[in-house]
Swiss-Prot record:
GO cellular component terms listed in the entry, alphabetical order: mitochondrial inner membrane; mitochondrial matrix; mitochondrion
Coiled coil: none
Listed InterPro entries: NDK-like_dom (IPR034907), NDK-like_dom_sf (IPR036850), NDPk6 (IPR037994), Nucleoside_diP_kinase (IPR001564), Nucleoside_diP_kinase_AS (IPR023005)
Summary of the function given for this chain in its UniProt record: Major role in the synthesis of nucleoside triphosphates other than ATP. The ATP gamma phosphate is transferred to the NDP beta phosphate via a ping-pong mechanism, using a phosphorylated active-site intermediate.
Known catalytic reactions: a 2'-deoxyribonucleoside 5'-diphosphate + ATP = a 2'-deoxyribonucleoside 5'-triphosphate + ADP; a ribonucleoside 5'-diphosphate + ATP = a ribonucleoside 5'-triphosphate + ADP
Keyword Cell inner membrane: no
MF GO annotations: ATP binding; metal ion binding; nucleoside diphosphate kinase activity
Organism taxonomic ancestry: Eukaryota, Metazoa, Chordata, Craniata, Vertebrata
Database matches in Pfam families: NDK (PF00334)
SMART domains linked to this entry: NDK (SM00562)
Broad class of enzyme this protein falls into: transferase
Protein name stated in the entry: Nucleoside diphosphate kinase 6
Active site: H118 (pros-phosphohistidine intermediate)
Names of the cofactor(s): Mg(2+)
Annotated source species: Rattus norvegicus
């Protein structure tokens, strides 16, 4: 299963926090299918969070998410969506600190907006969100061409590219 994971500006701004989150991804055996860092344009951010438009936190969220670089990942794992959400912990940092203190948000989150990470909440959301950040990525092509190679191994993690690839290919196929 694929999911989108975002590392928010509060974490990207601090190299040690960014590296800690990245290591959590690796140590939990996620395959990093794609990764990119970007400065989010306000109009793209508003479109992404349009379901929250009109809510009290919407403008603050858009301003924060466009305030600095973010890192976007496509992660693969059995039950990737649920596993990533469990690793992140509850959205509300106060709750995360009490219910899941070892989660990413419980240990690194600052506020409910500056809570370090975002993750897709369903298969439908994951597809939509992946397309928003990786418009040239084809899920269908990935499942047909790359996923079987990654599943059957051997798999290599390339620190230079920040992604996993089948050992014999040396990198992802162009989208």
């Amino acid at each position: 299963q694929l999911t989108l994971a975002l590392i928010k500006p509060d974490a990207v701004a601090h190299p040690l926090i960014l590296e800690a989150v990245h290591q959590q991804i690796l140590s939990n055996k996620f395959l990093i299918v794609r990764m990119r860092e970007l400065l989010w344009k306000p109009e793209d951010c508003r479109r992404f969070y349009r379901e929250h438009e009109g809510r009290f936190f919407y403008q603050r969220l858009v301003e924060f998410m466009t305030s600095g670089p973010i890192r976007a990942y496509i992660l693969a794992h059995k039950d990737a969506i649920q596993l990533w959400r469990t690793l992140m912990g509850p959205t509300r940092v106060f709750r995360a600190r009490h219910i899941a203190p070892d989660s990413i948000r419980g240990s690194l989150g600052l506020t409910d907006t500056r809570n370090t990470t975002h993750g897709s909440d369903s298969v439908v959301s994951a597809s939509r969100e992946i397309a928003a950040f990786f418009p040239d990525f084809s899920e269908q092509r990935w499942y047909e061409e790359e996923e079987p190679q990654l599943r059957c191994g051997p798999v290599h993690y390339s620190p230079e590219e920040g992604i996993h690839c089948a050992a014999e290919t040396g990198g992802p196929k162009p989208a």
